[in-house]
């Protein structure tokens, strides 16, 4: 399971002219689900994403996680993160989970975030989405479990 996380000052996702999720300061999480992923991996990745200390403390050091910083989380499904790009000029998506399994794990991940008392907004699974963000820093990390 893969999360591309970005520290943002704001972010939103729109589907068919409807804003489905919008946050102020916090994390934009682009989430990719791979074939071998399961709930255990989703738990580990959620723990890492929410615990990752990429927000500045009073001394300006990256030392706070999203909850300590008072931020929110916007989770957007992104199957292209599971692509194999090592060969050729066209990505292969054979490493991605089947759509029904990917959706179940995406929803599980979102629910785990919400259980941690963090404001968690979402896109719409498998929809054509427009994502807007202001990357703060920029600060972007690739987390994989």
From Swiss-Prot:
It comes from the Bacteria. Homodimer. Belongs to the DTD family. It is found in: Cytoplasm. GO terms for biological process: D-amino acid catabolic process. A Gly-cisPro motif from one monomer fits into the active site of the other monomer to allow specific chiral rejection of L-amino acids. It catalyses: glycyl-tRNA(Ala) + H2O = tRNA(Ala) + glycine + H(+); a D-aminoacyl-tRNA + H2O = a tRNA + a D-alpha-amino acid + H(+). One of its GO terms (molecular function) is Gly-tRNA(Ala) deacylase activity. It is an enzyme of class 3 (hydrolase). This is D-aminoacyl-tRNA deacylase. The gene is dtd. A motif (Gly-cisPro motif, important for rejection of L-amino acids) lies at residues 137-138. GO terms for cellular component: cytoplasm. Keywords: Cytoplasm, Hydrolase, RNA-binding, tRNA-binding.
């Amino acid at each position: 399971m893969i999360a591309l996380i970005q520290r943002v000052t704001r972010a939103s996702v729109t589907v068919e002219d409807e804003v489905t999720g919008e946050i102020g300061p916090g994390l934009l999480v682009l989430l990719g689900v791979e074939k071998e992923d399961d709930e255990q991996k989703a738990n580990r990745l959620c723990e890492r994403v929410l615990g990752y200390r990429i927000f500045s403390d009073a001394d300006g050091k990256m030392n706070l996680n999203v909850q300590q910083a008072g931020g929110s989380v916007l989770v957007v499904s992104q199957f292209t993160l599971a692509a194999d790009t090592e060969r050729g000029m066209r990505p292969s998506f054979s490493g991605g989970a089947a759509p029904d399994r990917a959706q179940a794990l995406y929803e599980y991940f979102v629910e785990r975030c919400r259980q941690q008392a963090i404001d968690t907004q979402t896109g719409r699974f498998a929809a054509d989405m427009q994502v807007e963000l202001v990357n703060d820093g920029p600060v972007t990390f690739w987390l994989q479990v």
